[in-house]
């Protein structure tokens, strides 16, 4: 679990489809909160975790080809984890490893100029490699929950069959 300096959750697993591509579960929850269905306090599978704190056996890393260097900054971890999952392995989140993470402190945010252009290119690459439909169907996330927010709230629109 990664925490912001203000003791709120920055990352507790990645849900693909959040925000249209991928997002962090329970973002901004209190560090001592149990989360939706006790998920902040439970060891569980996720589609991805952030590379800010990711451990992987070298054998698996090599088997899937490591991190794709064409993702210079964003989504290299999501792409890597999806390839690990596609190879038949699981991506595990544990609440028992807790670190503070100053997200984007050293590089800034991807909101304007070249940083935004790079982010948009990397997002398009993620969708190209894993398909938009594939990203929107996270097997570890309830389809009745919203993809608009990272708080596990209910979806306002019923999913289409």
Segments from the language model and where they lie:
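A short, glycine-/small-residue-rich helix N-cap motif at loop->alpha-helix starts
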Residues: 73-74
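Catalytic core of nucleotide-sugar-dependent glycosyltransferases
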Residues: 111-137
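Residue-level detector of anion-binding/catalytic polar loops
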Residues: 90
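Acidic/His-rich active-site region of diverse nucleotide-sugar glycosyltransferases
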Residues: 1-64, 78, 87, 98-110, ...
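Long, domain-scale regions corresponding to catalytic signaling modules most often appended to membrane systems
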Residues: 126, 132, 136-146, 151-156
